[in-house]
Amino acid sequence: MRPAGKVARGVGPRYPHVVVLVGATGDLARRKLLPGLFHLSRAGFIPECRIIGVSLDDLDVEGFRKVARGALDEFSTREVSEADWAAFAAALDYVPLTAGASALQAAVARAEKNFTGESRRLHYLSVPPNAALSCVRMLGQANLVEKSRVVMEKPFGTDLPSAVSLNASLHEVFKEEQIFRIDHFLGKEPAQNILAFRFANGLFEPIWNRNFIDHIQIDVPETLGLGKRAGFYETVGAFRDMVVTHLFQILAFMAMEPPTSLEPTPISEEKNKVFRSMLPIKPADVVRGQYTGYRTEEGINPESDTETFIALKCFIDNWRWAGVPFYLRTGKRLAEGQRIISIAFREPPKTMFPPGSGIGAQGPDHLTFDLADASKVSLSFYGKRPGPGMRLDKLSLQFAMHDTGFIGDVLEAYERLILDAMRGDHTLYTTAEGIEGLWEKAAPLIDAPPPVRPYAPGSWGPNVIHQLIAPHAWRLPFERAWRDPNRLGS
């Protein structure tokens, strides 16, 4: 753990903060938010911070502290010393949601008395979608809008009309610059490394276009099922749950033009240009699937048409990407849990190589980003096998974050995003314009979705996904040598 006060200047927020954590006893708060706030506080990122928990549970302050300590003991990835816990516990307060806006207003006022000078408020709404607007209105009734920012969890609507309506309701209370729509995928270090990789190196950006790139895959299969989210998942499905809020945001990082600076406004504008250039999604370019047994699970309609799997092809119609297909895939109960982006380069002429040389036998050259927490980047290419004759093997160059001395400096996704929200940095957050633009492009799919196709749990989805990507192949599971360079050529 980084000693308090050792954080580089400018990394933390400018002002002390009161964090109002709505849904403070829920699953996300226990797994990610409370451990994240503990680490940010004790590591010196937010040395002046008070946290007010709010939930439907009828607790007092000591009861909430027990919940918080249990969350740290079960889910914290860092050591929790008694001294650090005592300091963190002293910063906690609690207000039952049933106590109303006036009780919350009083608790925030008490917390702010601990600070000298100006302070700010961060409201984190870790609540179900149907409760978000009522919480926003409660914050308005409590006069907690001024000097505040609000963080919201997905989904941000379920189609264009609902997204427009949601944003209009939010803007009745908060200004757009106060609203932070969270995407924890973009908070992960590997996702942020995409921007550094592209724009800090002269090697790849000149070939980052349709002249050199054949296609791009963004592949996020999950082995997990629904867990406790059956009721929520049944109303949204894989497209609304994962593609709009996560995969399209990653696509924007991959496809955007260089911003004028790595600041929130220029980056958001370039992302929105990508969304504006996206062609409407054709239902014929989409495969929807549902794993066998889904309809028999508790809380699921026995005749459900909700997809637990989706694969699609989309296009960005601009000078950089016209004609280059982007293939996206995600789903529940699949063969592996992975998060990769794979860029397939155009293949060179092959006739100069003799028959049997192996040229092209293992697919095109690939640049692959592994978005797991280990943060790997791999470049695969052909090279000559030692010995007589011209025999080619697929070789690989790899980089992994754990190979550097900085792996201990990595913030978890929610930690980074909380810190950014406190600083007013929208770089890794989604705007109202971006969300509404994506729902507009998705309208043809939402209006006329293709039928769901069954697939076996533990598989890679319905077999028809291979027709979707033909004549190419999915990077997973067919080309695996890039994952372990020590096995290459064997």
Model regions and ranges:
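Secretory/organelle targeting and membrane-embedding segments
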Residues: M1-M152, F156-S490
